[in-house]
């Protein structure tokens, strides 16, 4: 309740990211993608329409969040490693990565490549030491899902860490030797890498 609008939206995007980028079948409540609120009423079954009605104007007010969820759905549909439903498949292809407090990070593999997924629930950026050195295509970071026409990349140098933005999810794809991906400008490659 004390967060400003930008922080509340970042938290909502992170929560949506956890749902859509986790294994299994995702499900959200109607309006979650546009920060539906019931005015703080945690038990609104008998509160009436003034509390329970869907405020469709919020789809415009929070269009960035709506677009982000659409991007997550497209990303999930494109990457089989994010849609596994069998424990055996998940166990065989998902590896947890070393990460900071308040961070969950894992690597998932499928026939299309190797992906790194990071959820940073901290109010500050966090260094993720478990991300191996190499070049990565950035599929999502800092509240943005990148499309095919907006390709980004980042290089993590040996001895450095990837820095995940505060209150955000990151999806990286290990770049193949054949990938030609523009590197984000302004990145000091000798230190910790941050996208955004």
What are these regions (language model features)?
Residues 151-180:
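C-terminal beta-strand-rich structural cap/linker in extracellular carbohydrate-active enzymes
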């Amino acid at each position: 309740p004390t967060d400003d609008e930008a922080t509340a939206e970042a938290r909502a995007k992170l929560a949506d990211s956890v749902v859509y980028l986790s294994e299994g079948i995702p499900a959200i409540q109607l309006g979650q993608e546009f920060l539906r609120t019931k005015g703080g009423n945690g038990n609104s079954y008998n509160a009436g329409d003034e509390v329970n009605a869907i405020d469709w104007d919020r789809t415009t007010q929070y269009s960035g969040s709506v677009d982000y969820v659409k991007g997550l759905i497209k990303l999930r549909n494109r990457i089989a490693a994010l849609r596994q439903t069998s424990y055996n498949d998940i166990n065989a292809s998902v590896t947890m990565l070393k990460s900071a407090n308040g961070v969950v990070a894992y690597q998932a593999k499928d026939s299309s490549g190797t992906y790194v997924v990071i959820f940073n629930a901290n109010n500050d950026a966090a260094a993720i030491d478990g991300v191996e050195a190499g070049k990565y295509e950035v599929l999502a970071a800092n509240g943005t899902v990148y499309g095919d026409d907006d390709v980004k990349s980042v290089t993590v140098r040996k001895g450095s860490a990837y820095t995940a933005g505060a209150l955000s999810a990151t999806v990286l794809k290990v770049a193949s030797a054949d990938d030609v991906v523009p590197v984000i400008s302004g990145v000091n490659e000798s230190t910790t890498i941050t996208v955004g």
